[in-house]
A protein has these predicted regions:
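Noncatalytic, solvent-exposed loop/strand surfaces
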Residues: 1-197
């Protein structure tokens, strides 16, 4: 199955034939909006999140005897996790992502994938991107601040905080062999993350 989060909604195609097997409208009534966060696939389930009064939805894929398959909504909530640009990450049944519009100062949130319940919101850290590695959330804010925190549904606990870039750090960063690669509008940096374990 090929999944795509299109401007109009959630599309699933048969990988062999290219034929549509599922579509559900999942978009804002605001025409100027986009669905920018990528689908978060977890086994046979998928989490979608969008801003502009859309929210999040969690679906489960079920294979049919005819090979067509279908997606059944587990839950959909308007105010659970409204990701504007950044794709959320998951760990042990919980998703972590930036909730709210980028220009209005989103908050980092943890939600339960079981029912979309909000577990916590982090103090205002602004917009950014995040990855998950070894039970940690690795966050790079648009202001160039690196935050390493526990990926735990209990609370937001910062383990390390450091200014590594200037403002305008909107590009997604990469992690490889315990090294973080990130850039702002003027430079590229590489940091060893194993020093924060």
């Amino acid at each position: 199955v090929v999944l795509s989060f299109m401007r109009e909604g959630f599309l699933a195609l048969n990988a062999k034939t290219g034929k549509e097997i599922f579509f559900e409208r999942f978009r804002s009534p605001i025409n100027a909006s986009v669905n920018a966060a990528s689908p978060l696939v977890i086994d046979n389930q998928v989490l979608l999140s969008s801003c502009y009064e859309v929210g999040a939805g969690f679906w489960a894929y079920k294979e049919s005897s005819a090979g067509k398959g279908s997606f059944d909504a587990i839950w959909k909530k308007k105010n659970a996790l409204d990701c504007h640009y950044s794709t959320p990450v998951q760990r042990d049944g919980f998703a972590y992502g930036f909730h709210g519009r980028q220009e209005r100062g989103p908050v980092l949130r943890c939600i339960s994938l079981k029912d979309g319940k909000v577990m916590w919101e982090a103090p205002a850290i602004g917009a950014g991107n995040l990855l998950r590695a070894k039970g940690r959330l690795i966050v790079l804010t648009e202001d160039g601040e690196l935050i390493v925190a526990d990926a735990s549904p209990d609370r937001f606990r910062v383990l390390h905080r450091q200014q590594i870039l200037g403002a305008g750090s909107r590009a997604h960063f990469a992690l490889s062999n315990a090294r973080l690669f990130a850039r702002d509008q003027r430079r590229l940096v590489c940091l060893r993350l194993d020093q924060f374990e």
